[in-house]
Amino acid sequence: MEDIEKIKPYVRSFSKALDELKPEIEKLTSKSLDEQLLLLSDERAKLELINRYAYVLSSLMFANMKVLGVKDMSPILGELKRVKSYMDKAKQYDNRITKSNEKSQAEQEKAKNIISNVLDGNKNQFEPSISRSNFQGKHTKFENDELAESTTTKIIDSTDHIRKASSKKSKRLDKVGKKKGGKK
């Protein structure tokens, strides 16, 4: 008796699910598949309807086999796998079409912008790949002017000192050369 009480919620849930499924099945089977296909003009919609039919039939067959306690479910599982692969292929096709449409729309927008820029005379709207700042010179400004002045003064002083020393040296050499020349 305890086992029956444990199963009752599952049976109620299953019964509720069947009640929800019944109107959907009636909607699918109200007209034959051929009649429904004739009403549709779009090939993609026809593919969707056929895939839905195959999935519903395979799923119902699977549920029926489970209820009957059939052990070998491989044929129906193979059929469900095949239907799923068809549904996946349809989804991939939709994704490709969407990407293709987005790409062509982006190309059209780009062409439209280029044509409008040329016609409007905005030829210089596109910037060069190298920034103009790369063609400008760099000017370094010294922060400490006193340091620069003292460095300049030191350089000038040392240059003057070197000149004086070299002129003294050349005068001495001249004197030595005259003395040697005078002894001859």
From Swiss-Prot:
Pfam families: Sas10_Utp3 (PF04000)
Annotated spans, Disordered: 157-184
Location relative to the cell: Nucleus
Keyword terms, alphabetized: Exosome, Nucleus, RNA-binding, rRNA processing
Protein origin, superkingdom: Eukaryota
GO MF annotation terms: DNA binding; double-stranded DNA binding; double-stranded RNA binding; enzyme regulator activity; protein-containing complex binding; RNA binding
Basic residues: compositionally biased ranges: 164-184
Principal cellular location given in the protein's record: nucleus
Record-stated family: Belongs to the C1D family.
Its job: Required for exosome-dependent processing of pre-rRNA and small nucleolar RNA (snRNA) precursors. Involved in processing of 35S pre-rRNA at the A0, A1 and A2 sites. Required for activity of RRP6 in 7S pre-rRNA processing. Also has a role in 3'-processing of U4 and U5 small nuclear RNAs (snRNAs). Acts as a mRNA export factor. Mediates mRNA degradation upon UV irradiation. Maintains genome integrity where it is involved in both non-homologous end joining (NHEJ) and homologous recombination pathway repair of double strand DNA breaks. During NHEJ, required for joining 3'-overhanging ends.
Complexes and interactors: Associates with nuclear form of the RNA exosome complex. Interacts with RRP4, RRP6, RRP45 and RRP46.
Protein name: Exosome complex protein LRP1
